[in-house]
Amino acid sequence: MKACGIVAEYNPLHTGHVYQMNKTRQISQADCIIVVMSGNFVQRGEPAVIDKYARTSAALKAGADIVVELPVYYALSSAENFAKGAVLTLNEMKAASICFGAETDNADCLAKISRTIISESPEYKAILNKALAEGLSYPAARQTALLEYLPECKDIITGSNNILAIEYIKAILYNNLNMTYYPVLREGAGYNDDSDTAEYASAFGIRKMLMSDEHDKLKTYLTAGMYEEISNSKSCPLFPDDFSNIFNHKMLFIKQICNINNTDFAEKLAEYEDISPDIANRFVAAFTGRDNITEFAMKVKSKNIVYSRICRCIMHIILEIRKSMSDSYNNIPYIRLLGFNKTGQQYLGSIKKELDVPFITKAADYKKELIFDFACSDIYAQAVYEKYGYVMKNELQQNIIRI
């Protein structure tokens, strides 16, 4: 059997995602579609609006054959690390190819950009360093350098929806993987578009509908399975500000153990993943213990520190994701199965003897490996309880979803 991979968050799953699944099966001619999905936290530095098991069920009903979880360390990483974790997971699962959404289906140009970033020629590096010296954030500086170095790829470089596409290809090329890649031209609203007039709304736009209680519009854009999960859920939607109390308490605790010394406070914060000394100092200066997460992030962001990075840093503090953990994730430590159908079961049976890392189907047998992800899920469940008074099942009580 031949498998093709999709990397997703399905936050939440909408009709545009189904379009991608159908195109993936058509383009790749795969027998099996494997989805590597973020769990309860997503790459923007936010909680998923609904838990990973509900999203897994909806994904399987919409056409996925297997859903595995992207470990939270990767799920809350930069685009580069997010893509690396997902691509390496698909490689471990013997996927022959990967399909991803982009604003172009020009795979050659996407690969050209990826190779430029990997090779870092002296000319490209000089342009990049100059842009960084001018105070641009790294993503903005890289875009500036690529535009000057590869003017023929201008439209692709400036497309925000191409960032992850480039990172997926980069991960494949950098790791010398034998994996074919297929960009799928996006249809409908873009990733950050909140329009509700396109045939396919963006997940961002749908989250805004959820936040505004515009449930009457949801049925138009969500898959039937996702709409049913959200309608019947006692634990959604969840948003970043629902974690504000947890964040403020955590920051106050760190400050207290530093004896309210701002220098020590900043040094402690800089131990967390992706928090530079500059970001740590900005956190210390902005922190009052009274802001919600959105207000705090808006205070801290700057010209060269983008909002989504600040949100990830906040989640790293909440979830105890530290720089010292990075060595444990140089390679995929395990693969955790969230759900499958009959086709997926057949595929898993065909590859199980070829897997090089633990393939987790029963969480109770891998408590040591999953202890960190368990803790993250418990924090998600705590936010649900504080908002809705609903007690979610813990990870040992949850069953794999079978369709």
From Swiss-Prot:
One Pfam family recorded for the sequence: HIGH_NTase1
Gene3D superfamilies: HUPs
Predominant location category: cytoplasm
InterPro entries the record matches: Rossmann-like_a/b/a_fold, tRNA(Met)_cyd_acetate_ligase
UniProt-recorded Gene Ontology molecular function terms: ATP binding; ligase activity, forming carbon-nitrogen bonds; tRNA binding
Keyword terms of this UniProt record: ATP-binding, Cytoplasm, Ligase, Nucleotide-binding, RNA-binding, tRNA processing, tRNA-binding
EC primary class: ligase
Residues binding ATP: 7-20, 101, 161, 186
SUPFAM superfamilies noted in UniProt: Nucleotidylyl transferase
One Gene Ontology CC term in the entry: cytoplasm
Role description: Catalyzes the formation of N(4)-acetylcytidine (ac(4)C) at the wobble position of elongator tRNA(Met), using acetate and ATP as substrates. First activates an acetate ion to form acetyladenylate (Ac-AMP) and then transfers the acetyl group to tRNA to form ac(4)C34.
Protein name: tRNA(Met) cytidine acetate ligase
Organism: Lachnospira eligens (strain ATCC 27750 / DSM 3376 / VPI C15-48 / C15-B4) (Eubacterium eligens)
